[in-house]
UniProtKB/Swiss-Prot annotation:
Residues 1-20 form the signal peptide. Disulfide bonds join 36-52, 43-57, 51-67, 59-65. This is U3-agatoxin-Ao1j. Insecticidal neurotoxin that induces an irreversible spastic paralysis when injected into insects. Modifies presynaptic voltage-gated sodium channels (Nav), causing them to open at the normal resting potential of the nerve. This leads to spontaneous release of neurotransmitter and repetitive action potentials in motor neurons.
Amino acid sequence: MRTIISLLLLSAMVFAVIEAISLEEGLQLFEGERGCVGENQQCADWARPHCCSGYYCTCRYFPKCICRKDSGK
């Protein structure tokens, strides 16, 4: 009985460590994307909200700046 409980506790600890590592990697991957907005959403170059990757903030109709797709120019 002790062996079974020990194995269950050990597997729970291993699972918790694996989950913590996965979560940490995921947070690092998308850390820069938090608080960003997508296409045709209102943005600000100088403050938040800023555009997500692949978009840029254009203020053609100031003060309503919006995110547009970055064509790679």
